[in-house]
């Protein structure tokens, strides 16, 4: 089983994340941020990755530290669960519609962290959640998972729909990229013979 647990504690947050890449999409997200928990639930459901997140953060300050640190820990957990990445598909892409919104997500599970994020949110907040934190989460996740990630909302008018299409698009792309290719079982998908540099 490709599983991992990451514990991360700072003066700002105390976080524990567990993932099972070969799960059923079961989510147990408890960050204290309702909208963010909703996005993590979507990520688990549509990636088929079991995700448990327990986070206590300085929400009296704002949601930034908790959102970013969950991205860091979840990225680290995915990276650890992947191990040497032998047999994975590595590459995947997804066009994700959400009503009037369409987002394109392309991923390379390469060990080479990079993020391109292009999404314009019409509103500064979704409920109490700052929309700028969507990019912050994707940045933290990509850097710590060691993935190259391109997220681009092609069009959209509703901030909730834009955020949701980004998370669902990542979920479906990640699901395909980390899946084991039976024709390449045990092979690292790189001419170098290794991933990560």
Curated annotation (Swiss-Prot):
One of its GO terms (cellular component) is cytoplasm. GO terms for molecular function: imidazoleglycerol-phosphate dehydratase activity. Its EC number is 4.2.1.19. It is found in: Cytoplasm. The keyword Cytoplasm applies. Keywords: Amino-acid biosynthesis, Cytoplasm, Histidine biosynthesis, Lyase. Its main location: cytoplasm. Pathway: Amino-acid biosynthesis; L-histidine biosynthesis; L-histidine from 5-phospho-alpha-D-ribose 1-diphosphate: step 6/9. Belongs to the imidazoleglycerol-phosphate dehydratase family. This is Imidazoleglycerol-phosphate dehydratase.
């Amino acid at each position: 089983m490709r599983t991992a647990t990451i514990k991360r504690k700072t003066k700002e947050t105390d976080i524990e994340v567990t993932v099972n890449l070969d799960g059923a999409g079961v989510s147990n997200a408890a960050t204290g941020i309702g909208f963010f928990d909703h996005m993590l639930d979507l990520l688990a459901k549509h990636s088929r990755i079991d995700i448990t997140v327990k986070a206590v953060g300085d929400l009296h300050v704002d949601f930034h530290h908790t959102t970013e640190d969950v991205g860091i820990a979840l990225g680290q957990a995915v990276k650890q669960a992947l191990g040497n990445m032998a047999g994975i598909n590595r590459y995947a892409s997804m066009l994700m519609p959400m009503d009037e919104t369409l987002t394109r997500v392309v991923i390379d599970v390469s060990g080479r962290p990079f993020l391109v994020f292009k999404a314009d949110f019409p509103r500064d907040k979704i409920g109490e959640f700052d929309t700028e934190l969507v990019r912050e989460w994707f940045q933290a996740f990509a850097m710590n998972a060691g993935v190259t990630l391109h997220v681009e909302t092609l069009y959209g008018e509703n901030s909730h729909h834009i955020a949701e299409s980004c998370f669902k698009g990542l979920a479906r792309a990640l699901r395909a990229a980390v899946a084991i290719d039976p024709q390449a079982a045990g092979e690292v998908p790189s001419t170098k013979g290794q991933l990560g540099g």
